[in-house]
Amino acid sequence: APHDISVALHLLGEEPEAVAAQGLTYLQPGIPDTVFLTLRFSSGRAAHIHVSWLDPHKVRRITVVGSQKMAVFDDVDSTEKLRIYDKGVQRPAYDSYGDSLSLRFGDISIPRIDMREPLRLECQHFIDCIVSGQAPLSDGRNGVQVLRVLEAGQQSLERGGEPVVLERNLRNS
């Protein structure tokens, strides 16, 4: 879950105001084998994360749903890692009775992504930051944010899925 949380925080550019987690335990009492984590943000956005070491399929997929387009990144797929869907919802003006939402379907684009070793890129970025003095994309502050979310998720699990609110002064530090 740490990587999923880190990606969500990076994509959304904010720390959640509340975290809720529910877990299912099958094999070892007190240790969830499957966890569903929900992060709620003050902007009204949400992130849903599902992790399970029991799952028979290796899944590393991120789905981003926007008002105009949607994107699916599949880290396991070696040929079509990213798909962008021109799909959205159009809201009517509601000036007449019976109007409803209409779904808009368009093209699917699959941009070319050069295949390079992620760990090598991460190490090279770190070295480049040391040499240039620039701040890395993922720094100690990001690590602390991820740990706060993980801790809130653990507290929520222990409280039966009750949302845990992150204190505002911690979210902005």
Regions flagged by a language model, labelled:
Residues 1-5, 75-76, 119-123, 150:
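A structural signal for well-ordered alpha-helical scaffolds and beta->alpha junctions
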Residues 33:
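Short, small/polar residue-rich loop motifs at catalytic or cofactor-binding pockets
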Residues 1, 30, 115-119, 136-143:
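Aromatic-acidic/polar surface patches that form glycan- and anion
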Residues 16, 59, 159-161:
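Short secondary-structure junction motifs
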Residues 42, 121, 125-173:
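C-terminal helix-rich "cap/oligomerization" subdomain common to oxidoreductases
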Residues 25-30, 42-121, 168:
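NAD(P)-dinucleotide binding in Rossmann-like oxidoreductases
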Residues 1-26, 38-45:
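Oxidoreductase and adenylate-handling cofactor-binding alpha/beta cores
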